[in-house]
Amino acid sequence: MREFLSACLLLGALVTVGASAPIPADLQAITITATGALTPKYALVHLFAEKGFKGYALVDGTGRVAWHYRTKDYPFGADRRKNGNFVFMDKGHGLIEVDRRGAIVHELKQRDPENEMHHAIVVTPRDTVLYLAFDTEDFAGKRLKGEAIWEWNPDTGEDVKRWRSWDFMDPALDRSARTAGEWLHGNSLHVGPGGNVLLSFHYINQVISIAPDWKSIQWRLGGVRPTIAVPADQQTSAQHTAAELETNRILMFDNRTGLQPPYSRAVEYVIDGASARQVWEWKAPGGNYASAVSSARRLSNGNTLIAFGMEKGRNGSTGPTEAFEVTPAGDVKWRLLVEGVMTMFRVEPIDGFEP
C-alpha cells in the first residue's frame, strides 16, 4: 500500500506540473475562438488531436484556456464529485479523480480490451462513479462485446458490476447493421430524477431507462424493439448524452448518422404513456453534421450548451468543430470554434471551480 500511495503521489506531482505550467505547445496549436457571452464560468472541452494534445481544457467565455489536463489517450467523459474534484475517463489510463492542482487523488486502472472502460461516466448522488465497460461473451461462434455498468467508490476502492446487457437484452434481436464485434456501443450515462439510470446505445438508436434497483429496464425509447414509440419523422440515430431533465422529459444530442438530409441537432422529447413527442430541437446555422461524439447539456437558466464535435471530412462530417449556448427560443448566446482537433468529444458547463 505504501508503494502504491507513493506512486500515486509521484504521478500526481508530475501531472500537477503539467496542469499549472504554461499552456503546452501542442495545446497552443489548437485554435480556440469564442464570441458572445457564456452563462457558466467555464466550458470543459474534451479535445483529441491525433498527433497533438489529448485531454481536457477548461475554457472561459472569451476562449482562454484557464486549466488543462493531459490524457494518455482519448478523453472519454468527465464529471465532478462533491469535493469539487474532477473524475476523468482516460482511454489509456482508466478512471482518475483529479484535484484542481491536477494531482491524481484516486485511480482505477484501465482493463483489457474485452472489458475496457469506455465512453461514459457519471457521478451519482452517493458520490460514487458509474461507468461503462465492455462485457464480452461468446455469441454465434464469435466473441461479442456487450455492455456493463460498474460502480466505483474512489474513497474505498470498491468496484462493483451493477448491470449487464446480456441479462436483459438479446443480441439476436436487439441489433442493427452496425452490430459486428461490438453489439450495442453504449455512449452515455445519466442518473434520472427517480434514481433510474439512462443508457444510450449508438448502434440501435435507442435510450433505455434502468430501474434504480438494477433489476429491470423501465422503458426503451425509439430505435430497435422500443417500448416507447417515436414518430418516424422525429427518430434519432446514433444519439449521445441522453438526460432526463425531469420525469419523462428527455434531452439528447441527435447525430442523425446515416439520415437525410445530413445535419445533427439537439432534441428534447416528452414521454406520454407508450409514445414520445418532440417538443424542442436546435440545429446549427449551416446545418452542421457530426457523424459521432458531441453533446447537449441543459443549463440552470434554461439555455442549452450544444457541441458538434467532428472535424470536417471525418466520416462524412461537415464540420466545423464548434459549440453553442442557445436560448429556448433558439437564439445563439455564445459560440466556440475549435480548430486543429480530430474530435471534441463533449463540452460540459462548469461553475464553482478555481484553477
What are these regions (language model features)?
Residues 1-4:
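Positively charged n-region of N-terminal signal peptides that target proteins for export
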Residues 21-355:
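Histidine-/acidic-rich catalytic cores in large beta-rich domains
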Residues 6-16:
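Bacterial N-terminal signal peptides
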